[in-house]
Structure formats: structure tokens, C-alpha cells
């Protein structure tokens, strides 16, 4: 009895293993055979190219439809040759659709990604990126303004039935991009400010008044009332300190008239004050006009000698020193320590 149960369990296990080993459908079996028959380099290239349909070669190329003799033999032996041909015919329209969409994928990758999701309802891009600075009411106002300005912005799925010309497709892509981009006005950050401008003006005026009219002197005088600032005291003017000659002119004024002017006074450069010879009584002019020197040493610019005179001559007289000459004989009387402090001595030092 036990042997029968054991044989029954073994047969059930073997049946389960056989069922699990069988493929679910013939399509998966053909795919597995294709993968085993292809070399590893082609399989690695296909894995790298997964999802990028634009790099696939079209079906018209004879190299893609060509199969090796070894692959044909294996398919003929397994009886799957007709099934492979049917699968290739089914894959042809799907590949043609991907080729039609390849142009849009090259120009705008997001465009194809949006359309693959299958959105049939028009999408309105009214969400403001400035959610950090605006409230819901402000966002609603901005969305209404942008809707009025730009109209309805929608995404339209391109037709995949017929391949359009390059110029028409480029124009459609550009218009589609323009419609998708939302138009925003310049942000107004002053909406967030809760400060009253009058309060700001009062604060600024108080700050400026505090800088200009500082009243810390008043507080210091209240704290130290009996303190007298010696620097602020002004000495009374003494009548003895007033110098009378500062108010008067340095040289006495000289009034000219047409009768008093001589031709020699016109155009002469004044190198001396007007009352120069009147002050010294023409002592320098008389010195050189005497017959001791004959004629003046230097010629005059004008024939009339009324104002300009020759320069003074200076002579050096050399004397022999005597043996009893003491150059420091008179130095003692000018020393400060030799006389009493009360005596009005001359303020000079001898070196």
C-alpha cells in the first residue's frame, strides 16, 4: 500500500516539473531561441540601445532581414519558421510609428514624453513659480491675466498616420513650444510689504534729526552744573593789546593827477613804494649826484632822473688786527648771568 502512494507522489511531481518546464506560449519560445542564436556583441548593443528607437535601421535594409543558415536550420528543425515570419509582419507597423515620432523626439524630448502618457485633456500651465512670495488671491489674479494675454495653452498630440515635411513639422514644434511656455509678468515684491510709508518717513526724519541736533551737551550740563569749562571762557579785550597800525595802511596813499605825472612815471615798473624818496629825503639820490663820483655808474632808462636811481655802491675796508685785540672782550656784558634780573638788558645772545 505504501509503495502505491510513493509511486503516485513521484508521478505527480514529475508532471508538475514537466508543466513548469513547458513555455506559456510560442512567442516567448521564439524570443528565447533568437536570443540564444544571436552573438553576445549584438545582444549587448541591443541592451545599450534600449528605449532609443531613432537609432534602429529601417526594415527595408536587406541586412536586417537576412538570417544565417544555422538559424534557418534550427528553426526548420523546430517547426517555428512560419511563426517567426508572422511575428516580423506584426512588428512592422509598430516600428513605422516609432520612426514617425523619431523626429519629434530629436527636437524636443519632453514633447514626446508628455504625449506618451496619453493626456487627451488640454493642459493649462497656470501655476506660478513664485508661490513663495504670493498668496492664493494674488496667484489667481496672475493666472487670469496670463490667460487673457496668452489665450489657452494646450498640448496637441501629433498625427502619426502620415509623415509630414520637415518645414511643416519644425513650425508645428515651434508653435507647440510657444504655447507650452507660460507667460508671467514682472514680479511685484512690494505686495508682501506690510510697512506703512509714513512710518518709514517718520523714522528716517527722527534718525536724521538725532544725527544733526545732538542734545548730549544738555544732559552733561544738568549732571555737572557747577563745572566751568575753561576752554569756553573768552578773555576780555584789553585796550593796551590793540595794535593801532593794523587798521591803517602800510604806505600813505598817493593821489595822481594829470599835472603831477611826468612822462617818466608812465610805464615804469614800481619797485619801491610811492613815498620812498620823500621818506628818506632823497639821500640816496644826492649821494650819487655829487661831483665826487662824476657821473652815475649805470645809465638811466629815461633822460629825466625823477624816480629811478643807480644802486648803492658798497666798499670793504680791510684793517690789520692789533696784538691786543680781544674779540670776546664785550661778550661778558651780554651774558644773562652777569646782570641782575631786574636790569633791562638787551635780548640778544653772542655765540
Curated annotation (Swiss-Prot):
It is found in: Secreted. Residues 1-21 form the signal peptide. Residues 51-69 have a biased composition (Polar residues). Residues 158-176 have a biased composition (Low complexity). GO terms for cellular component: extracellular region. Residues 22-177, 192-319 form a propeptide. Keywords: Cleavage on pair of basic residues, Secreted, Signal. Disulfide bonds: none annotated. Residues 51-71, 136-176 are annotated as: Disordered. Its main location: secreted. This is Prohormone-2.
